[in-house]
A protein has these predicted regions:
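Secreted/periplasmic carbohydrate-active enzymes, especially glycoside hydrolases
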Residues: 1-233, 272, 287-288
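Substrate-binding/catalytic cleft of secreted carbohydrate-active enzymes
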Residues: 206, 212-301
């Protein structure tokens, strides 16, 4: 059916044409070493196998397969633009509701025609930050052209303005001081498989100890928890190749560094960055996008 080598972002496979009536067998084979092993040299305990969720799902005839949310206040912080971009299979209708603090801020219906962009102006939005992680509830109710309900998509929206001013990083007009940690996804009991309860414990512990930043290509639930609890994130591409870097530093020969300037590695780099961005692009907690960690440099990065 398919093959994938990025071990930190989801791999999605279309099964429809392979299914038959009655019982079907679904098999997955995990390889310990592949070409991607050169790019996944992060410092952690190494285990083989599948350690994140595996699930089957179906989609309706009218389906939003991609959703992009931009919620950015202007410089006054008194009003913000909410932009919703949808990519849809089939034509239909969308009823959008934005609510928060028990109040409906926005409710509107729009038609869906494949690729659609909708924008609204929001007055006096409650801003998102580590100190006050205000989130709004966004709900998209998708129907076909006859009005029959197809799917409901819930999301969280955080309004925040992150920018550089005179060489200083600011959020909502105020200087940010990052107090971060290189957090690894690991359990002393279950290894690389970490339950939501353990993820929540990590986040609460970080907040209680004045840690406001972390980086890593984590499992999806951690990003939602960082949105909710107010943890700034550096979303990091699944790239670390310091093993080849160490060899080069020892020998003085940089020709074996990966990915460096090698065109044969560029496709993998772009695929990994795109997978990270597409999965996590709507999280207000993500302030910085990282091309990777400890990978020397070069044209590919």
């Amino acid at each position: 059916v398919g093959y994938s080598e990025d071990s930190f972002t989801p791999s999605e496979f279309e099964l429809t044409e392979y299914l038959k009536d009655g019982e079907n067998k679904l098999a997955a084979q995990v390889f310990k070493w592949t070409a991607s092993s050169w790019c996944e040299d992060q410092d952690f305990y190494r285990f083989s196998g599948i350690y994140r969720d595996v699930y089957l799902f179906t989609v309706p005839d009218v389906h939003v397969y991609d959703l992009r949310i931009r919620a950015i206040p202007d410089e006054t912080l008194k009003k913000a633009e909410l932009e919703i971009v949808t990519s849809t299979w089939g034509k239909g209708k969308m009823k959008l509701t934005l609510s928060g603090k028990g109040e409906i801020l926005l409710q509107e219906e729009r038609s869906l025609n494949g690729e659609d962009t909708c924008t609204w102006e929001i007055q006096d939005p409650l801003l998102w930050s580590a100190e006050e992680p205000n989130l709004y509830d966004l709900e998209l109710e998708i129907s076909d052209e006859s009005g029959k309900l197809q799917e409901i998509i819930p999301e969280k929206v955080g309004f925040r303005r992150f920018e550089m001013k005179d060489g200083i990083m600011t959020l909502n007009g105020k200087r940010i001081v990052f107090k971060g940690v290189n957090r690894h996804e690991f359990s002393s009991v279950t290894g690389r498989h970490v339950s939501r309860e353990e993820l929540l414990k990590d986040i609460v512990t970080m907040k209680q100890n004045n840690i406001n930043t972390c980086h890593y290509p984590d499992a999806s639930p951690i990003y939602r928890l960082c949105d909710e609890y107010g943890i700034y994130m550096i979303a990091e591409n699944n790239l670390e190749s310091h093993g080849t870097w160490d060899i080069a530093e020892f020998t003085g020969d940089h020709t074996d560094i990966v990915p460096h300037n090698k065109p044969e590695w560029l496709g993998m780099m772009l695929d990994r960055v795109n997978s990270m961005y597409q999965r996590d692009k709507n999280h207000p907690a993500i302030l910085i996008w990282s091309c990777g960690n400890e990978s020397f440099g070069g044209k590919d990065i």
